[in-house]
Design a protein with these regions (language model features):
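Residues at the starts of beta-strands that form the adenosine-phosphate
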Residues: 44, 67-68, 93
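Short, acidic/turn-prone active-site loops that include or flank metal/cofactor-
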Residues: 48-54, 74-77, 100-101
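Short, aromatic/basic amphipathic alpha-helical patches
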Residues: 81-91
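A generic structural motif
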Residues: 95-103
Length: 126
């Protein structure tokens, strides 16, 4: 059977304390994106293991007690589709923030650019 990625959010157990403190979670597609945010000082990032959010992942987010999701999916077709689905499925449950990103993948950004272009506007969320 193997690992059921749809039942988990990558880094959830490590992110939950800071997420509950700030009432925010950074939602990204992959593990590399979580690592990049961690390098930049963000301790409350979780990864979807892809572009789609499952019912089980949504339940984990609801159970966390956060009120705001910072959605940073990739800047490609799949990432744009993911944003549309997240907006449709989650907008009644959370305040959603979709920071604009000028690169395809968060994991490829330099830390200083990530801080300047995205994180500077999100003080108090991490």
């Amino acid at each position: 059977e193997g690992f059921k990625k749809r039942d988990y959010l990558y880094n959830y157990d490590n992110a939950i304390e800071k997420a509950q403190e700030t009432k925010c979670i950074f939602l990204v597609e992959g593990q590399g994106d979580v690592w990049k945010l961690y390098e930049a000082g963000v301790k409350n990032a979780v990864g979807l293991f892809g572009k789609d959010i499952s019912k089980k992942q949504r339940s984990l987010l609801l159970k966390s007690g956060v009120t705001k999701l910072i959605v940073l999916t990739d800047n490609d077709q799949a990432g744009r589709e993911s944003k549309i689905k997240i907006k449709r499925d989650m907008s009644r449950l959370f305040k959603l923030v979709f920071p604009s990103m000028h690169t395809k993948d968060l994991g490829n950004m330099f830390i200083d650019k990530l801080k300047e272009e995205i994180l500077d506007d999100l003080k108090g969320c991490f």
